[in-house]
Amino acid sequence: TGARMSSPSKRALGDVLAATRLRSSMDEALAHLGAYRPFLRAPAEMARLHAAHPSALSHTCDVARDSAFDLRLVAPRLPRTRVPGGHTPQTWLDHLAREGARERYGTREEHPGAWETIDRELGVIERLGFAGYFLIVKEIVDFCAARGILCQGRGSAANSAVCFCLGITAVDAVRHNLLFERFLSDARSGPPDIDVDIEACRREEVIQHVYELYGRERAAQVANVITYRPRSAMRDAARALGYPAGSAQAWARGKGQAPALVSEAAGALARLPRHMGIHSGGMVLTDQPVSRICPVGWAAMPGRTVLQWDKEDCADAGLVKFDLLSLGMLTALRIAFDELRASDAREDYVNPHLRGWAQRQVHGRHDQPVGLHTLPEEDPRVYDLLCAADTVGVFQVESRAQMNTLPRLKPRCFYDIVVEVALIRPGPIQGRSVNPYLRRRSGREEVTYLHPLLEPALRQTLGVPLFQEQLMRIATDAAGLSGARADQLRRAMGAKRSPERMEALKGDLMAGMEERGIDAPTRERIFEQLKGFADFGFPESHSFSFAHIVYASSWLKVHAPEHFYAAILASQPMGFYSPATLVQDARRHGVRVVGPSVNDSLVDASVQRMEGADTGEAYREGRAQSLPTRGVVPLDVDSDLAVCIGLSQVRGLGAAAERIVAARREGAFTSQADLARRAHVSSSDMEKLAMAGALECLGVGRREGAWAAGALAQPSARAGQWQPFLPGTEVGSTVPDLPSLSE
């Protein structure tokens, strides 16, 4: 239509947005805006303007009506999956799932219940025609496994025994009696939703693999609409109205009072779309060029293309999204497990507590390396660590809120971790479920149920509803609804609440409860309880997936603390705490931590065999946060090992860290000049190394090294340029007698 605004009253806001788009002030943008601002006219006004030709409006409506169509009719299909000869996607999926079932559950005679569940799930997948989707996700997971990239499926997919058998998820849905209908059912119209967490530092490898495998024209990342927040709205409004950038920045930070006109414009911009970003992990795959369906552009990051639609637009157009998400803790776990497996084979370099750990028997299956999904179960010392809230660096349970809750919850089994992960979330907190659960957990409140039929669904959470799956179980146990209908009820009551669908399902729910002898007042109370916690209930499957990572990171902290802390430091930035705080926590547990050294450190933090006394406060980079004063749980510390801080932890060093490690392969550095010559270290980088204490292995103190850095002129970051000598550091000048740098 060419309209720039919805009504003439929005002209000022439209001008501000236009000026923002042009990156200029409104005065400068007038030439582009013109005197007339087109806007959307109301039907009555259009009729008045076309009074001489009234048929124009009716003909326009006829054309619009005839042009309308259901986008699902032209929705693209998924790429054709590669299957062996003689197989269809469905038969190949059946084969892979049953092969995985034999490995995990044994024969049908040994575990008939598991096989019955798998057959039922495969039947649903076949009826919905989603076999190709599962095969694509499995191919991505298999690629990660082949490349040594740690990944794990999570979310509602953990409710599926088929996903467990395919190796997509680590949660045994049969063992934990999870609801498949929360993930997929015959009543679902859209595709399944499988989120795959991939270690953060290697996710790009997986994304590029998907592009290469399916073709760049047939794959693209989903966009994300970034909306205005108070600060960005204030900055853009001030710039559009011609105010200096310094004033705009100050007002955005709350320093000084912005003019009324600026504040009014900023308020109008709030929550409006500002620009397009990239979804955290969504990728779309199609059997035809994506550009035939929606516009595609190049992303700022090389090698990426991005749709100009967000995930809701993609869903409306029938595009299927795959979520490849990054998770920093998976990077840390992979680093720790890889190093432990390597050290297990070296007699002179292994924690004695872990001798032979890499070939332990797990679940009675054949020998395999212990890793994220194969750790010894229900280790009491892991729960001792959690009960003491000694969880700095541990995934998901290291926040202050989690640390305050853990000693009250006192987890002693894996399901307690599942509950802990779900408990400290905005939903349960807003739904006031946290304190009732903790009171019942400690015996200070009686465990009660609105009706005995609710007990099977709520028994594990002591009568306090926490999970979305519990809503579905209540609907099936107390009212006899099918799993598919129970999932429809959950969706109708969820965050995007549909009063119409909810009322339609309420009749079935109430009738079912009446048939089972539940009186009218109790029926109403049950319905209100369901409606109340549907908004905040956390997915139990999601909590199970994260609980595995909580357990693994806790296990590493207890049994391999040096590798745990080194891996966490090597995976920064992530988590709640700074590197300095993590170092402080390691030292208070008796773990040796030595500062960066140009002759000993790798690029990232590592575990090394060290002899002699602990260097104590050698690492001073950054400021540590205060840590809880409660008791410290004993860890399996190896006195012969130490965490060596990586050169990448030296603030601002950048690519010089890799050059130093590469040059050191020819031999240790003998002097500051030798380091500068062989590793091409600039004087500014040399100063950073000196101030971090990384030159002490050369017999050079921090002040002395910083002074001498000026005499070691090397090429600067810009090619072909040299840094000038600093005053007093020219060749031939002597270093004054400098005192040691104070704390």
Language-model features: locations:
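Acidic carboxylate-rich catalytic motifs and surrounding loops in phosphoryl-/glycosyl-chemistry enzymes
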Residues: 1, 73-76, 375-376, 596-597
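Alpha-helix N-cap/helix-start capping residues at coil-to-helix junctions, especially the first residue
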Residues: 1-67, 72, 81, 89-91
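Active-site-proximal loop/turn and secondary-structure-junction residues that shape catalytic pockets
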Residues: 3-5, 77, 649
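Noncatalytic, beta-rich nucleic-acid-contacting surfaces in large DNA/RNA-processing enzymes
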Residues: 36-37, 85-351, 355, 364-743
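Cationic, low-complexity basic patches in intrinsically disordered or flexible, solvent-exposed regions
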Residues: 360
